[in-house]
A protein has these predicted regions:
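Membrane-interface starts of transmembrane alpha-helices
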Residues: 6, 148-160
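Alpha-helical DNA-contacting segments of helix-turn-helix folds
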Residues: 60-67, 112, 128
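Amphipathic alpha-helical linker/stalk segments
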Residues: 63-90
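Amphipathic alpha-helical packing segments from all-alpha helical-bundle domains
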Residues: 69-73, 89-92, 96, 100-107, ...
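Amphipathic C-terminal alpha-helical segment
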Residues: 101, 134-139, 160-178, 192-197
Length: 197
């Protein structure tokens, strides 16, 4: 972001820009979303948009950052709300939450994932990794006799990245010979088997 909004009015303007961007991506696709279209949909002039963002990509990166932060918070809330349920039940719930988030907002994430090579430098993946790692630490700390910190760190990294990549690839290119439900079961089984090692 070029200029972080400080006043409430500025924050509202940025929120309008981000919401309009999400709507434009859903309506026109990522490649055909332009700053003038965002301006038209948001009711914010192109000049005002450029006060906050250098270009369309910077707007999308901020939207990705915020959505990743929200997904991370939702995962933390899910884990805390579930209390001490066994991992065999918690992992499928977390995977379901992830799939729902990737498909939400009229396919925003799906459209961005189709062009991930343009946004792979975004903070979104690091934000999700951080939240998921914290969830892993919280979850595994309930079984301290089973894993030490180094094991948790290593297993979390592998689980987070392999699961995220698989889910992202599936929702962005849904032409695989596996149903979503079957993939969810396979991911859960894979994670549980890996944790049992």
């Amino acid at each position: 972001m070029r200029k972080a909004p400080q006043q409430q009015r500025s924050k509202i303007i940025v929120d309008h820009i981000l919401e309009a961007t999400q709507q434009c991506i859903a309506q026109y696709g990522l490649l055909h979303t332009t700053t003038p279209k965002i301006a038209e949909k948001s009711g914010v002039s192109v000049g005002s948009i450029y006060q906050y963002f250098e270009n369309k990509d910077q707007i999308i990166e901020e939207l990705l950052r915020r959505k990743s932060e929200l997904l991370g918070q939702q995962l933390k809330e899910l884990v805390i709300q579930q209390g001490n349920i066994p991992l065999e039940l918690l992992i499928p719930l977390a995977i379901e939450l992830g799939f729902n988030a990737l498909k939400a907002d009229h396919g925003f994430f799906i459209e961005v994932l189709k062009h991930w090579h343009d946004y792979s430098h975004s903070q979104a993946a690091q934000i999700l990794e951080k939240h998921f790692f914290e969830v892993g630490l919280y979850t595994f700390s309930r079984n301290p006799h089973q894993w030490d910190f180094e094991q948790v760190k290593h297993k979390s990294f592998v689980i987070i990245n392999s699961t995220l990549f698989t889910m992202m690839r599936y929702v962005s290119q849904n032409n695989f010979l596996i149903s979503e439900q079957q993939l969810k079961r396979e991911l859960s089984s894979m994670i549980l088997a890996y944790l049992s090692q």
